[in-house]
């Protein structure tokens, strides 16, 4: 709904009702098990949420930040804590995946058919998924979450008692979802799927989390040390966005002439300047869109730059947290991502666990990795369509860890 309401129908009213119901259930039943807080991922989520509340109190736009905080609390309570409770029955894990896969496939197939009628042109690819998704990038980010799940059901469907026919259906679903990502013309989603494939091989090699963390730290340090040389090399790429998929892929690193990439750099520069001004608490959750305009440098402005804040946000989860919640906000948000990876790897590498649990967790990890990589270039965690798989995938991993130490549970 437009007109300033900013309401997404029918999902947000449904989330509100579930939020009220779950709160009432907890108050009446008194069944609050706080033991799962000992799991590092849960602790990291609560710390991030707690710091967000502090930055609401120090916000430069208190009511805007309060509204943002409440919206995030709805998503977290329903898609993480409520689903965590539901997922103690493993049957609901299969249903969660199946229903979302079937529904997503219908939307993607419908979008592809419409796009086919326009010769799969890039221009139409940016809006063809409406009214289901407002933007091609959030559409692609959502689909990328479920590609590993569809592939897992295809290859490991026997662990879930799926028939050969059902596994063939999931194979078709996998192809449809991959086609959806490709013809979304979303370069960040393409990169995220490649990153998920690379991460899968790390899992197969049983690379430990500490080794991955050290490697990521080395890459980050190397970038800051050699950033001038890296940027100079990237400036040599003049390939612009194009209908041709290969040329469009080559434009990923074009920071000289590609408007989308240039505007992304502009938004990041604004976020850094905002961080330097308020490094501890930031400007407040949900305020970047309204505050970044004065920090734009004239030399960074592009054809799609705006002062009205109506064309996207920070274009990065990480820069967004940095500008809105300061350094602690960024570190706490990154800690959530890292703790989820650590928990996932721990489950996958536990040989005493049943095969279906390791397979599910592998798919969850790969799905989350697609978003963590995509999050460098876009930020959608405050959208319900992304919040559902983001928090839902984490909830499943925590449920597997908490409810089934050395499980004998079967998925039927």
Predicted regions and their residues:
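A membrane-periplasm/extracellular boundary helix in multi-pass inner-membrane enzymes
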Residues: 115, 183, 204-259, 267-277, ...
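Membrane-interface micro-motifs in multi-pass membrane enzymes
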Residues: 5-14, 68-72, 132-146, 188, ...
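Alpha-helical transmembrane segments of multi-pass inner-membrane proteins
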Residues: 15, 19, 49-57, 74-78, ...
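Transmembrane signal-anchor hairpin modules in multi-pass inner-membrane enzymes, especially those
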Residues: 1-53, 63-64, 88-98, 153-169, ...
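A juxtamembrane structural motif centered on a specific transmembrane helix
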Residues: 157, 346-362, 372-379, 390-412
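Membrane-interface helix caps and helix-loop-helix hairpins in membrane proteins
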Residues: 58-67, 182-183, 376-381
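Long extracytoplasmic/lumenal interhelical loops at the membrane interface
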Residues: 121-125, 255-269, 281-325
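Selective detector of the "anchor" transmembrane alpha-helix that sits immediately C-terminal
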Residues: 324-346, 394
């Amino acid at each position: 709904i437009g007109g300033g309401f900013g309401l997404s129908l029918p999902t947000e009213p449904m989330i509100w009702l579930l939020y009220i119901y779950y709160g009432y259930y907890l108050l009446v039943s008194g069944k609050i098990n706080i033991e799962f807080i000992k799991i590092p991922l849960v602790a990291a989520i609560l710390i991030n949420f707690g710091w967000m509340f502090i930055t609401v109190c120090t916000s430069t736009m208190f009511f805007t930040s309060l509204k943002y905080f409440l919206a995030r609390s709805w998503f977290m309570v329903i898609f993480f804590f409520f689903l965590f409770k539901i997922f103690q029955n493993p049957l609901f894990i299969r249903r969660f995946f199946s229903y979302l896969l079937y529904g997503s496939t219908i939307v993607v197939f419908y979008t592809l058919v419409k796009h086919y009628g326009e010769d799969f042109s890039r221009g139409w690819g940016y809006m063809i998924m409406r009214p289901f998704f407002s933007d091609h990038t959030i559409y692609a980010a959502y689909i990328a979450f479920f590609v590993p799940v569809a592939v897992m059901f295809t290859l490991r469907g026997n662990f879930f008692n799926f028939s050969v026919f059902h596994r063939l259906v999931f194979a078709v679903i996998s192809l449809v979802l991959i086609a959806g990502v490709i013809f979304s013309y979303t370069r960040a989603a393409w990169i995220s799927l490649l990153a998920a494939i690379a991460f899968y091989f790390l899992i197969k090699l049983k690379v430990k989390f500490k080794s991955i963390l050290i490697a990521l730290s080395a890459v980050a340090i190397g970038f800051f040390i050699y950033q001038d040389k890296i940027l100079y090399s990237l400036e040599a790429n003049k390939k612009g966005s194009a209908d041709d998929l290969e040329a469009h892929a080559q434009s990923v690193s074009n920071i000289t002439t590609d408007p989308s990439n240039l505007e992304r750099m502009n938004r990041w520069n604004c976020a850094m300047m905002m961080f330097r001004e308020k490094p501890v608490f930031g400007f407040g959750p949900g305020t970047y869109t309204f505050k970044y305009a004065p920090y734009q440098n004239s030399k960074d402005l592009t054809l799609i730059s705006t002062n009205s804040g109506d064309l996207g946000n920070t274009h990065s989860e990480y820069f967004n947290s940095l500008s809105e919640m300061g350094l602690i906000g960024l570190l706490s948000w990154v800690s959530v991502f890292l703790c989820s990876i650590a928990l996932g790897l721990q489950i996958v590498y536990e040989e005493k666990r049943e095969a279906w649990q390791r397979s599910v967790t592998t798919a969850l990890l790969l799905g989350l990795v697609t978003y963590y990589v995509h999050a460098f270039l876009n930020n959608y965690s405050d959208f319900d369509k992304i919040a559902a798989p983001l928090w839902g995938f984490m909830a499943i991993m925590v449920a597997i860890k908490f409810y089934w130490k050395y499980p004998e549970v079967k998925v039927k």
